[in-house]
Amino acid sequence: MAIITVTAQANEKNTRTVSTAKGDKKIISVPLFEKEKGSNVKVAYGSAFLPDFIQLGDTVTVSGRVQAKESGEYVNYNFVFPTVEKVFITNDNSSQSQAKQDLFGGSEPIEVNSEDLPF
């Protein structure tokens, strides 16, 4: 059994809303593999339900086993119990800055005798 992991951005093209017994849910369809340049192979897409906290524009990672299901003349590929996680991407391209805070609470330096030091 192979696990497929795909990262994609949820947008209007690859996300749709369906009505279920538990209310409206979003489904994302993502390509299961990349098409090679010049290849005539049709790319298979896998679908997975998105958690409610995922919004359009969010980048998500979908990971899980994919199961094929025939529906008439078509074959639908669905993730079975997938793990869907939101990928957090910062909007700035600057280097990561360190938090500047006084770890000692702004206290004054303490005078210590060299005789009291263990070294």
Swiss-Prot record:
- GO MF terms on file? single-stranded DNA binding
Q: Which UniProt keywords apply?
A: DNA-binding, Early protein
Q: Which Pfam families match?
A: Phage_SSB (PF16773)
Induced by what? Expressed in the early phase of the viral replicative cycle.
Query: Which region is the signal sequence?
Result: none
Stretch list, region Disordered = 96-119
Q: List the disulfide bonds.
A: none
| Superkingdom of this protein's organism | Viruses
Question: Record's family?
Answer: Belongs to the skunalikevirus SSB protein family.
Functional note? Binds ssDNA with nanomolar affinity but no sequence specificity.
Share what the entry says about its subunit structure, partners included: Homodimer; two homodimers can further weakly assemble into a homotetramer.
Name recorded for this polypeptide = SSB protein
